[in-house]
Regions:
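Active-site diphosphate/adenylate-binding microenvironment
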Residues: 4-8, 17, 25, 30-35, ...
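Cofactor-/ligand-binding subdomain signature composed of acidic, glycine-rich
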Residues: 1-14, 133-201, 325-336, 344-348
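Short acidic-hydrophobic, aromatic-tinged amphipathic segments that line or gate anion-handling sites
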Residues: 44, 125-130, 250-254, 313-323
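Structural signature of the thiamine diphosphate
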Residues: 17-18, 59-70, 75-96, 119-172, ...
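Active-site-proximal loop->helix
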Residues: 33-35, 56, 99-121, 244-249, ...
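Anionic-ligand anchoring segments at beta-strand to alpha-helix junctions in alpha/beta enzyme folds, i.e.
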Residues: 17-55, 186-187, 193-271
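Glycine-rich beta-alpha junction loops
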Residues: 26, 99-100, 157-163, 210-212, ...
């Protein structure tokens, strides 16, 4: 078994069904090996499309999408797709071919330092230097991409490594990484603070972002909102966290959001941001968002907490687990008057349209 065969075997172990890509010399050993696999390869017109298509599949399935491209221009062409996946927290495995190991750094034909180029917008990147490391690296890559705050991982594999004989293929059953241990369970002290603030609040609201969908926490969010009568708005990435016909859902906030959703968030006295970047598209003036309200920020990525605005109660953890813990608590709160006000906004704050009669047959 050569390195290219080992790569395909790793993908099969991870139950990968599709690989998007465009062949080139430095990735040809991999494409030759995958011909004998049940994995379907999907040829794209440009490498950027491979990253976007793999990212799109990941958005639909929740599992890491995979793309494979050649070195040099093939690798640099996927950068936009990788950056998009990083910004949207989408699990993506990008496999890039590379020139012979002994030629690295010599500026040979179609050599590019792709691991250095993508450093700022991948969760991690690998340059494979030993063919026997392939099983471990792929196991780690899939684990990193699909846990914590999900995102892209790049694996750069020189052509000589793809053609080298592997001594023994053993795919690891588990990952052991001392430096990577994302927080899943939220701190119960902080969770109880959230419950305490809900009991004090008269006008609470939840703003759900894409992190709720990525953690598969829609059911828990709906149960929590319905149990305590808390209205919910979403960012653009959070669309789908609740059915649009749910009376507790008030639509998308932000520049292109619903006017009544923005007003609801502005007038709230307790704002619970869950899995959402406090970015300009959702909040045009982040420095003003905490005026006259308490901000609770829940995110699986500790780096996102307080990134754009200070939170009174920061809570690091997976949204699904945090909502489950909150549902187990007894919270004494009632917000019917607030919901009635928001229903009035929803009925009255609608755009006035004057259709042109000439468009009607």
């Amino acid at each position: 078994m050569i390195g290219a065969d080992a790569i395909v075997k790793c993908l099969e172990e991870e139950k990968v069904k599709y690989v998007f890509g465009y062949p080139g010399v430095a990735i040809c050993p991999f494409y030759n090996s995958i011909l004998d696999s049940s994995i379907e390869t999907i040829l794209v017109r440009t490498e950027q499309n491979a990253a976007h298509a793999a990212s799109g599949l990941a958005r639909v399935t929740g599992r890491p999408g995979v793309c494979a491209v050649t070195s040099g221009p093939g690798a640099t062409n996927v950068i936009t797709g990788i950056a998009t996946a990083f910004a949207d927290s989408i699990p993506l495995i990008c496999i890039t071919g590379q020139v012979n190991s002994e030629l690295l750094g010599s500026d040979v034909f179609q050599e590019a330092d792709i691991t250095g180029a993508v450093e700022s917008f991948v969760k991690y990147s690998y340059l494979v230097k030993d063919v026997n490391d392939i099983p471990r690296i792929f196991k780690e890559a899939f684990h990193i991409a699909s846990t914590g705050r999900k995102g892209p991982v790049l694996i750069d594999i020189p052509i000589d490594i793809q053609n080298a004989e592997i001594k023994k293929f053993t795919y690891p059953e588990r990952v052991s990484m001392r430096t990577y241990k994302p927080t899943v369970k939220g701190n119960m002290v902080q969770i109880k603070k959230v419950a305490s603030q809900l009991e004090k609040a008269k006008k609470p609201i939840i703003c759900a972002g894409g992190g709720v969908l990525l953690s598969d926490a829609e059911t828990e969010l709906r149960s929590f909102a319905q149990k305590y009568g808390i209205p919910v708005v979403s960012t653009m990435m959070g669309i789908g966290v609740m059915p649009t016909e749910d009376p507790l859902y008030f639509g998308m906030v932000g520049n292109n959001g619903k006017p009544y959703a923005n007003r609801a968030m502005n007038e709230s006295d307790l704002l619970i941001m869950v899995g959402a970047r406090v970015a300009d598209r959702a909040v045009s003036q982040p420095d003003l968002i905490t005026e006259n309200k308490v901000l609770i920020q829940i995110d699986v990525d500790p780096a996102e907490i307080g990134n754009n605005v200070g939170a009174a109660i920061p809570l690091v953890g997976d949204a699904k687990h945090i909502f489950r813990d909150l549902l187990e608590l007894t919270i004494d709160c009632e917000h019917q008057e607030w919901l009635t006000t928001l229903d009035t906004y929803r009925r009255t704050m609608v755009p006035k349209r004057h259709p042109d009669p000439s468009y009607v047959d």
